[in-house]
């Protein structure tokens, strides 16, 4: 199979995305978390659709996705779980609720969800066979499916308790974001080739819009444990605002990444982080836990907004610095852990 050249600005965008994931799992001012959670997980689905290339759904395709997405999920989930045999079935089920019951790292919900979304999106692309209007019909069906799943979750106690296997309800939403990413590429490439000043203006305007709209969309129930929208638990608030914020900010961040790639010469570390975002997703929680023990010992305490942001920046640096040797060791000795 012909190897596709990586787009540096996509790796820049993955760096931005995984950085937001890290900050999103810290104690930060509520406004910061509300803004981050408005779009940071949809961004990764958008980027997947953005980099899509035509391929048949055959054994080779499925085995590659199992190796690069599902196997890393299983291995990391088993590493972080309590080690009880009963945990294995919950991990294989793959929902966020089941991972919580298994006592493993719930942020891993994204991987089985992403795996299912990739398959759904590939099915959509294989069905349309060049008839792009059919893709809009498929998007409508995906959204209807997501609404039905959301209704059943509220009506069926078992679904409410365990969630859907592979977070299938969120995978339907993820596939919609992938479709958006597929169309975004044509627009971004047009901006990139001819209209850089217009791209700058567009990015600024989109940031301005979502700096307001991200704060007016709250989940239906203001649960103190989830005071903001959150894709992992299906807390969307107003669905229209959720999709608008996620799509506009994803487009803005891709545009910002294009500009960053053009303007910044030395960015090896940024590209390295973006290219290894999967590993960082899987290990950053453990490093953050260690960092939370270190920060008070170096005098970084306090609960004010400024103090929390400073602690967050220092913790972020610790995560990146400690992730680098972990990434290199995994690549050298256990590449299968990250699907290599």
Describe each PLM feature range:
Residues 1-340:
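Alpha-helical transmembrane segments and their immediate juxtamembrane cytosolic regions
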């Amino acid at each position: 199979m012909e190897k596709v050249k990586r787009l540096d600005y996509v790796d820049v965008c993955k760096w931005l995305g995984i950085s937001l994931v890290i900050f999103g799992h810290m104690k930060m001012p509520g406004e910061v978390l509300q803004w981050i959670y408005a779009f940071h997980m949809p961004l990764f689905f958008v980027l997947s659709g953005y980099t899509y290339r035509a391929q048949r759904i055959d054994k080779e395709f499925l085995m590659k996705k199992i190796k690069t997405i599902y196997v890393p999920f299983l291995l990391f989930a088993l590493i972080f779980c309590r080690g009880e045999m009963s945990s294995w079935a919950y991990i294989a089920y793959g929902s966020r609720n089941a991972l919580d019951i298994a006592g493993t790292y719930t942020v891993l919900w994204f991987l089985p969800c992403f795996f299912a979304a990739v398959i759904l999106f590939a099915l959509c692309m294989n069905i349309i066979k060049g008839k792009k209007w059919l893709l809009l019909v498929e998007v409508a069906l995906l959204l209807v499916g997501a609404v039905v799943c959301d209704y059943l979750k509220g009506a069926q106690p078992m679904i409410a308790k365990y969630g859907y296997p592979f977070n299938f309800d969120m995978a339907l939403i993820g596939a919609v974001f992938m479709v958006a990413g597929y169309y975004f590429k044509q627009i971004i490439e047009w901006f990139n080739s001819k209209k850089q000043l217009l791209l700058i203006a567009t990015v600024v305007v989109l940031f301005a819009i979502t700096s307001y709209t991200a704060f007016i969309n709250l989940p239906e129930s203001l649960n103190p444990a989830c005071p903001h929208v959150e894709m992992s638990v299906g807390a969307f608030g107003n669905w229209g605002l959720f999709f608008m914020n996620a799509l506009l900010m994803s487009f803005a961040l891709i545009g910002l990444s294009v500009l960053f790639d053009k303007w910044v010469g030395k960015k090896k570390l940024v590209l390295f982080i973006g290219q290894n975002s999967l590993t960082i997703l899987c290990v950053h929680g453990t490093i953050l836990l260690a960092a939370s023990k270190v920060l008070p010992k170096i005098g970084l305490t306090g609960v004010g907004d400024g103090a929390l942001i400073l602690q967050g920046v220092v913790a972020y640096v610790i995560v990146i610095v400690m992730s680098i040797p972990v990434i290199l060791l995994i690549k050298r000795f256990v590449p299968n852990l990250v699907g290599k």
